[in-house]
Curated annotation (Swiss-Prot):
Any one of the GO BP annotations: translation
Role noted for this protein: Binds to 23S rRNA. Forms part of two intersubunit bridges in the 70S ribosome.
PANTHER family linked: 50S/60S RIBOSOMAL PROTEIN L14/L23 (PTHR11761), LARGE RIBOSOMAL SUBUNIT PROTEIN UL14 (PTHR11761:SF8)
Protein name per Swiss-Prot or TrEMBL: Large ribosomal subunit protein uL14
Keyword match rRNA-binding: yes
Family of the protein in this entry: Belongs to the universal ribosomal protein uL14 family.
Gene expressing this chain: rpl14
Xref: SUPFAM superfamilies: Ribosomal protein L14 (SSF50193)
GO cellular component: cytosolic large ribosomal subunit
Keyword line: Ribonucleoprotein, Ribosomal protein, RNA-binding, rRNA-binding
Subunit annotation: Part of the 50S ribosomal subunit. Forms a cluster with proteins L3 and L24e, part of which may contact the 16S rRNA in 2 intersubunit bridges.
InterPro entries: Ribosomal_uL14 (IPR000218), Ribosomal_uL14_arc (IPR019971), Ribosomal_uL14_sf (IPR036853)
GO terms, molecular function: large ribosomal subunit rRNA binding; structural constituent of ribosome
One Pfam family it belongs to: Ribosomal_L14
Length: 140
């Protein structure tokens, strides 16, 4: 008897090289009040036991605010990775790498908390998160 195959996911997303992981400290690119955050989780990651979950451009992550306004500090919030230092390859063959690692804080529903994103964001983020693209200054 043939083995039963796994069903295809509802959406197909090319896996981008993961440049960050749980424990990474990342700059905040928006004006939500947070300045520096630490990644503490990657929702939806299913991996091997004790493997540190990785995250890349466009991924939703759970972060804790380390530096920022007194109202934002010590809060656990969700964020989307908009820039990463590690180079990743696009389908057209070009390689993209940013100067820093950065996230944008979002609500649990996925709407951005800030009203502007400073610096460039990746095209992959703009395609996956249209609301972030609306408040971004530059899309690369």
């Amino acid at each position: 008897m043939p083995k039963k195959g796994k069903g295809k996911p509802a959406f197909s997303r090319r896996r981008i090289a993961t440049g960050l992981q749980v424990g990474s400290y990342v700059r905040v690119a928006d004006n939500s009040g947070a300045k520096l955050v630490k990644i503490i989780g990657v929702p939806g990651y299913k991996g091997r036991l004790r493997r540190i979950p990785p995250a890349g451009i466009g991924d939703l992550v759970v972060v804790t605010v380390k530096k920022g306004t007194p109202e934002m500090r010590k809060q656990v919030v969700k964020a989307v990775i908009v820039r990463q230092k590690r180079p990743f390859r696009r389908p057209d063959g070009t390689w993209v790498a940013f100067e820093d690692n950065a996230v944008a804080i979002v609500t649990p529903e996925g709407t951005p908390k800030g009203s502007e994103i400073r610096g460039p964001i990746a095209k992959e983020v703009a395609e996956r998160w249209p609301q972030l693209a609306n408040i971004a200054t530059i899309v690369v």
